[in-house]
């Protein structure tokens, strides 16, 4: 079976401009409505809206990976880092602090150049113990083994996708990072969608690829 990365120039994504632009128009319209509502709120309400939005995004992103974050810990960590006063603040686990740190770097420093080291830093804070589930994984560096997306019981696994070989990952990521930093002609919403698909197609890390892709 051929996977997307087996084709020549696979990273040169093509799309139906008319259909995409219609959808982007709807997205931009809804963004404008949200911005308008935010501007009508007082400063305290704006702060609460920001806290709620980022907190729920982090909680939902982790749920996709089968992890449950404590919402109170996430909100408290965000409030401390953003300098927002909040009643009933609690201490957060090392893992929650790391997830929040990654998300804030991605959202507040979105205009900073992306680099391998920056991605390695995000990966480090996602796995501070170097363990995912029951297994030790390679942290803060690209994977050195194969990567498959599978489902099914042991012995009856179904392979849904096989990522590029580990030997290809550094070059594939160099190309991806260069594109992220250089292509300023594409709509940012569309660029985020392409970046997500491109990144998960490479699957450069032992674990955490989905969470990092959503941060991107």
Residue ranges and their predicted role:
Residues 1-216:
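FIC/Doc superfamily catalytic core
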């Amino acid at each position: 079976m051929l996977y997307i990365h087996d084709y020549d120039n696979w990273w040169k994504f093509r799309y139906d401009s008319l259909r995409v632009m219609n959808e982007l128009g709807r997205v931009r319209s809804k963004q404008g409505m949200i911005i308008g509502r935010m501007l009508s709120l007082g400063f305290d309400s704006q702060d609460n809206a920001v806290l709620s939005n980022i907190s729920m995004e982090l909680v939902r992103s982790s749920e996709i990976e089968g992890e449950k974050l404590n919402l109170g810990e996430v909100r408290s960590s965000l409030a401390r880092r953003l300098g927002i006063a909040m009643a009933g603040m609690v201490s957060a686990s090392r893992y929650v602090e790391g997830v929040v740190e990654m998300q804030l770097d991605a959202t507040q420093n979105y205009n900073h150049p992306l680099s391998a080291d920056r991605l390695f830093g995000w990966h480090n804070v996602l796995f501070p113990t170097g363990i995912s589930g029951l297994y030790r994984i390679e942290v803060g560096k690209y994977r050195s083994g194969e990567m498959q997306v599978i489902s099914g019981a042991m012995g009856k696994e179904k392979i849904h996708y096989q990522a590029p070989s580990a030997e290809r990952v550094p070059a594939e990521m160099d190309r991806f990072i260069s594109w992220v930093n250089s292509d300023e002609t594409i709509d940012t919403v569309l660029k985020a969608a392409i970046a997500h698909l491109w990144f998960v197609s490479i699957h450069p890390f032992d674990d955490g690829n989905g969470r990092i892709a959503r941060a991107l």
